[in-house]
């Protein structure tokens, strides 16, 4: 028995308890623990227990005003509602999943757990199954260099996907690095930059509209926030995916895109440019089988021109199978207030049925009412000159009833004001 093992155990236990934050409780640098036999097993159990109790993804809220991390509970609820346990995606080993806007790996961690369960009968060997899921099914584009590291930590337990078991303070990839032969794995570290035209003559980025003089273009800044997924021309995607993933077509696209690019005019987001709609539009253009995203709900009712393309695209193809709308953003992001609420949806290619619309109303974070109905997402109004979304079924019912009354009927039932005059 190692004479230092008991001391190591006590030291590690005290260390984790005193720093129940990020570095020691969830980094999972278990290679630094040299205990053997029963003592090593106890250490492993302690580490796993502490990692679960102090989940890294529950400790970090967000790293900036523009990027809102998805809470673990919200991610789990979104997956459970949009892709129930009996959904085909959990038992199909041939599907390719893409998160084009990964911030911390929460979606793919939860997805990997569900795939591991759903593929048990198809790939009985646990090692082969997990290897297949990690190397052949899940593909991610980090939003920034920092978030790319977080994603690898979450998925591979290591910032370097080919890192083998070591005594260095860098953890280890799943199965000691046997999954990948490169340090990135299936997580791309973003490398695109804002484009201001030939000779940089334009004032704004061609792709996202960022001003040339904004903080995002500062040459001294490590992060450029030129998100790869929306900084590619339409003819560049195939080569980008082939180069980085060896895959050119994705079956399921899922994620929580950055909502805006702040221009510094206000901490509440006033004056900031919304960009989440660009991620949705680009994803639809790739024609996956399924698309699921959680985004601000204001695109449904806002008169801003930047949302017109998204509404027009969705009106045209009618492929949204289900959408969940939350008037209070705190139902999904307890520590954030997002004006206009939040929604998450599942878009299914070539789906032509009605949309299941679930609308949740809350007061002070407590659920008060859920309105659920299957109906057309877009409703024609004003003699079919416009199409709008009624987020509550009763609003649509009231409009339909009023609209069904002809002008003559209105005249016959209308009481003249003059008869009440003296």
From Swiss-Prot:
This is Uncharacterized adenine-specific methylase MPN_111. The lineage of its organism: Bacteria, Bacillati, Mycoplasmatota, Mycoplasmoidales, Mycoplasmoidaceae. Keywords: Methyltransferase, S-adenosyl-L-methionine, Transferase. The keyword Thylakoid does not apply. Gene3D superfamilies: Vaccinia Virus protein VP39. One of its GO terms (molecular function) is site-specific DNA-methyltransferase (adenine-specific) activity. Its EC number is 2.1.1.72. Belongs to the N(4)/N(6)-methyltransferase family. It comes from the Bacteria. It comes from Mycoplasma pneumoniae (strain ATCC 29342 / M129 / Subtype 1). It is an enzyme of class 2 (transferase). It catalyses: a 2'-deoxyadenosine in DNA + S-adenosyl-L-methionine = an N(6)-methyl-2'-deoxyadenosine in DNA + S-adenosyl-L-homocysteine + H(+). PROSITE patterns: N6_MTASE. GO terms for biological process: DNA modification; methylation. The keyword Glycoprotein does not apply.
């Amino acid at each position: 028995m190692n004479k230092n093992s008991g001391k190591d155990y006590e030291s590690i236990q005290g260390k984790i308890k005193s720093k129940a934050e990020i570095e020691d409780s969830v980094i999972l640098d278990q290679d630094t623990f040299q205990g053997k036999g029963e003592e090593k097993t106890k250490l492993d159990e302690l580490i796993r227990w502490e990692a679960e109790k102090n989940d890294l993804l529950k400790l970090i809220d967000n790293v900036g005003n523009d990027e809102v991390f998805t809470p673990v509970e919200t991610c789990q609820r979104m997956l459970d509602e949009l892709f129930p346990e009996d959904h085909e995606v959990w038992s199909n080993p041939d599907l390719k999943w893409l998160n084009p806007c990964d911030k911390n790996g929460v979606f793919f961690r939860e997805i990997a757990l569900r795939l591991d369960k759903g593929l048990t009968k198809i790939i009985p060997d646990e090692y082969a199954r997990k290897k297949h899921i990690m190397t052949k099914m899940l593909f991610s584009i980090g939003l920034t260099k920092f978030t790319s590291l977080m994603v690898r930590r979450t998925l591979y337990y290591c910032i370097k996907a080919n890192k083998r078991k070591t005594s260095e303070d860098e953890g280890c990839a799943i199965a000691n690095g046997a999954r990948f032969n490169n340090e990135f794995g299936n997580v791309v570290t973003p490398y695109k930059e804002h484009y201001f035209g030939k000779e940089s003559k334009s004032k704004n980025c061609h792709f996202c509209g960022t001003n040339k003089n904004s903080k995002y273009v500062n040459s001294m800044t490590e992060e450029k926030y030129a998100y790869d997924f929306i900084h590619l021309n339409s003819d560049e995607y195939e080569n980008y995916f082939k180069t980085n993933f060896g895959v050119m077509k994705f079956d399921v696209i899922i994620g929580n895109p950055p909502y805006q690019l702040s221009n510094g005019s206000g901490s509440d987001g006033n004056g900031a440019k919304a960009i989440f709609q660009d991620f949705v539009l680009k994803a639809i253009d790739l024609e996956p089988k399924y698309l699921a995203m959680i985004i601000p709900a204001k695109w449904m009712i806002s008169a801003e021109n930047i949302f017109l393309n998204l509404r027009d695209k969705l009106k045209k193809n009618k492929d949204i199978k289900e959408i969940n709308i939350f008037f209070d953003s705190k139902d999904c992001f307890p520590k954030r207030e997002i004006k206009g609420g939040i929604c998450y949806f599942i878009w299914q290619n070539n789906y032509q049925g009605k949309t299941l619309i679930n609308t949740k109303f809350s007061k002070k974070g407590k659920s008060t009412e859920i309105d659920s109905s299957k109906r057309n997402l877009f409703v024609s109004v004003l003699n079919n000159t416009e199409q709008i979304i009624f987020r509550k079924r009763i609003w649509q019912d009231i409009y339909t009833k009023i609209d069904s009354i002809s002008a003559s009927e209105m005249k016959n039932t209308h009481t003249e004001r003059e008869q009440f005059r003296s």
